Amino acid sequence: MQFPESWLRTFVDPQLTTDELSHALTMAGLEVESLSKAAPPTSKIVVGRVLEVVKHPDADKLNVCQVDAGTGATLNIVCGAPNVAPGIKVPVALVGAELPPAEEGGKPFAIKLSKLRGVESQGMLCSARELKLSEDHSGLLVLPEDTPVGQDIRETLNLDDTIFEIKLTPNKADCLSVFGIARETAAITGAPLTPVDIRPVRVELDETLPVRIAAPDLCGRFSGRVIRGVNAHAKTPQWMVERLARSGQRSVSALVDISNYVMFELGRPSHVFDLDKIHGGIEVRWGKRGESLKLLNGNTVELDETVGVISDGRQVESLAGIMGGDSTAVTLDTTNIYLEAAFWWPDSIRGRARKYNFSTDAAHRFERGVDYATTVEHVERITQLILEICGGKAGPVDDQSVNLPQRAPVKMRVSRANRIIGVQIGADEIASIFTRLGLPFEREDDAFLVTPPSHRFDIEIEEDLIEEVARIYGFEKIPARPPVATSEMRATNETRRSIHDIRHALAARDYAETVNFSFVDAEWEQDFAGNDHPIRLLNPIASQLSVMRTTLFGSLISVLRHNLNRRADRVRLFEAGRVFLTDAASKAGELTVEGYVQPKRVGALAYGPALDEQWGAETRPVDFFDVKGDLEALLAPAAARFVKAEHPALHPGRSARIEVDGRAVGWIGELHPRLMQKYELPHAPVMFEVDADALIARALPAPTDVSKFPPVRRDIAVVVDQAVEVQALFDEMKKALAEEACRFVQKVVLFDEFRAKSNTSGGLAAHEKSLAFRVTLQDAAGTLQDEVVDQAIQTLVERMARAGARLRG
């Protein structure tokens, strides 16, 4: 937001210097990014009147002018400007004057006594470009007739005016105008605010244009009026051109300039149609697929049902709230106009200009929210200026309100405001702050009920009001207090590890941590979780980040691809992050949202060689059992069961559900071949994802005696059908450990598997396999006897027989 200080001070004039005013605005949340002068430094440039103009004797394009510059003597100045004429007043650079450099960083241009084609020139008549006021170099800068001769041009044109450039946060749409900034300045400084003098013009026509609002969800209010007999050739007043230029807007024509001027003045974009180019009445509606519109910027856009339009009886005439159409644009031949000012719902405008790869001042304002209560006043203000500058006769204002925002009062507790701000602010002082801000309120014990004004779209919840109190009270008045807390020792819970312990454990096993967004592509949810109905974001930062994740697998695969694209050949990653699930049983709380749960999970991925390239081991690809071993070490001392099961993201024959104490806690397996092909991975990574709670919880360490007696090891080889899972045999042996005969069994591990290559190989049928287990037994009280060991082994064999196993002969 850019504007000249002089314009601001016509509305509010606090007794502050420019720098003090800048500081006050910045400390109230309106950050002043820069202060600059309206024009570069100049000297000895004054107002002069051209008394006489004669042709140069030796140059057809030059004139010799007699000029009164208030010096007491008539100056002889040679000039080549096409608009030089007797009687006009123009800037005159006297001998010794310095003009701004022609190029950035150059030296000032000094005016010297000189001769042009043999005629002495005692100065120079200046254009706006030579003074660096604009790029207009078509002729001399003609000054108003009442300008005093001899006056310094810096005083005449207020060239020492300061340009403020303010960086507004998106919620401060009420400050996207000079009057909006003035309103804030008055609240901050306490200086009186002078509103714009808007008076209804005299209605001389009994004519309105038929208007139909077909989409109340697009347009809540539409005000317009017919004006006939305007002079489109009228010259925009210099004061208006100056204010527009210093607000960053070039002058176009009187009608367009007036519309732009009121937008910068009051914050409401409007549009001026050429009335004679409108066919019948106009309709405000949503666009239709297949329609197109040529815009004022020359672009032609294809419309659809997501874009609002203004159309007449034949075609679309304007992109609602964004830009007008070329077919009804005003030109120098325009004599009759239709003036429009409307309230467009912010949601109906937001993102539409970006959809067509451009932006406009109108869209920037409407998508943030523009005052819906002042459309008629703004039509009157624009009409007032048009009649003053361009003439004409105005019809009545046609004002249609169909769907305006219903602003519910917002409650703010004084006690909560003081607690959040950190300083005691009395209720009377808060009432004064709300009054200065123009916020109507009612007192209710320790609280204020504030009804947001029509121009404040940023006030919706209690914290918004607390922010307003803090801003106007003054952040600088809030003392800096370091936090104070009691220092106490906390008991360490040995039954739980911290998530940091888990992260360090994974890092110690050669996994690198990665941190990803919690919002992902909807396609990932379908691929990696089989989720057709993900939790969608209302306002995603990007289309490919539009849903909340329910699994970490997609994020890990994305990071893997990123690394592979940079020629990494061995990748081991992990992430400890939250996933987001729907749960009707979840109630709203301080850290919970009703209907949703946010459990933390730990996911990891291994790809490429199992070990870094080295001389001590052969290079082999990482496999399921490598990652399974890492996970078992992570879960220890808890023992996990790995149950064959299918997951949408994992290989159907190489995946398992992870169970701890009979509860499913996660998944492990190779990436599904379909996804490996889709995401262009040369090899399948092995991944796991586990509930963080299962890793954090652990049993208390129990002390045991170190046996002085040697352990006994026995091997058991059994034959089972190939369809029988090893886990089923382990489950049966685990049950046997509770029996008296197996009380000395310390450990059972699988150390060999053999599958027949033919019907007679190894005495096994083609559908069978041989499994060998090593059983470790030990007694802390004495040496184990053979009969005790034999009985334990026999019990284990009998248990495995229940799963279809027999001893191998």
Curated annotation (Swiss-Prot):
It is found in: Cytoplasm. Residues 405-480 form the B5 domain. It comes from the Bacteria. Residues 707-808 form the FDX-ACB domain. InterPro entries: aa-tRNA-synth_II/BPL/LPL, B3/B4_tRNA-bd, DNA-bd_dom_put_sf, Fdx_antiC-bd, Fdx_antiC-bd_sf, NA-bd_OB-fold, Phe-tRNA-ligase_IIc_bsu, Phe-tRNA-ligase_IIc_bsu_bact. One of its GO terms (cellular component) is phenylalanine-tRNA ligase complex. Binds 2 magnesium ions per tetramer. SUPFAM superfamilies: Anticodon-binding domain of PheRS, Class II aaRS and biotin synthetases, Nucleic acid-binding proteins, PheT/TilS domain, Putative DNA-binding domain. Gene3D superfamilies: 3.30.56.10, Bira Bifunctional Protein, Domain 2, Ferrodoxin-fold anticodon-binding domain, Nucleic acid-binding proteins, Phenylalanyl-trna Synthetase, Chain B, domain 3. Its cofactor is Mg(2+). Its EC number is 6.1.1.20. It catalyses: tRNA(Phe) + L-phenylalanine + ATP = L-phenylalanyl-tRNA(Phe) + AMP + diphosphate + H(+). Mg(2+) binds at residues 458, 464, 467-468. Residues 39-154 form the tRNA-binding domain. It is an enzyme of class 6 (ligase). One of its GO terms (biological process) is phenylalanyl-tRNA aminoacylation. Its main location: cytoplasm. Keywords: Aminoacyl-tRNA synthetase, ATP-binding, Cytoplasm, Ligase, Magnesium, Metal-binding, Nucleotide-binding, Protein biosynthesis, RNA-binding, tRNA-binding. GO terms for molecular function: ATP binding; magnesium ion binding; phenylalanine-tRNA ligase activity; tRNA binding. It holds the Pfam family FDX-ACB. Belongs to the phenylalanyl-tRNA synthetase beta subunit family. Type 1 subfamily. Tetramer of two alpha and two beta subunits. This is Phenylalanine--tRNA ligase beta subunit.
